Amino acid sequence: MFSQYLVTVGLLAVGSLVAAGPCDIYSSAGSPCVAAHSTTRALYGNYSGSLYQVKRASDSTTQIITPLIAGGVANSPAQDTFCTGTTCTISIIYDQSGKGNHLTVAPGGSAGKGPAAGGYDNPSSATAAPVYLGGKKAYGVYIASGMGYRNNAAVGTAKGDGAQGMYAILDGTHYNGGCCFDYGNAETSSTDTGAGHMEAIYFGNCNVWGSG
């Protein structure tokens, strides 16, 4: 579903934390989040569940990272402790909306195979995008060439020209003119089914194809 540097990925995220999270605000206006991804913070004021999972290189074990408190910033100290003396990657980015639209490392598709085993993309480093929210350290998702995450069985997302909104917080210094970085609603197949079908946020300076 997305494949550069996302400080916070999701339908919306902001630096200052308030009692109502971004997805609470949208829900109150009749537009509830159907996919809410963030490795830096909870997107609902009462959310205390899984934000993302990290995988440790030394022994391939995993750990789920949650907010420090409900509605709060991610528990980066837990990640730092777990990854001490080795490196970690982000293996899953959890959907906070309750619809189960979690993101895992993207498989290869018609546009080409990824560099990892089985043609999959590489996962993002769990420490390559440190940020601070309200004075607390968290980690965003740094996407470089050959990295990406996807869900080909999303539930509740818009189809065709159905109404939808998409939001992301991005690092404005990390982009290029190639194909492609985007986050949003894509086809449910990684292979070419004919004309491309995707409504997404594209972040880059290429204007050969649809952009905005």
Positions of PLM-derived features:
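Fungal secretory targeting signals
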Residues: 1-20
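GGW-centered surface loops in extracellular recognition modules
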Residues: 17-118, 160, 167
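Extracellular glycan-recognition modules
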Residues: 98-212
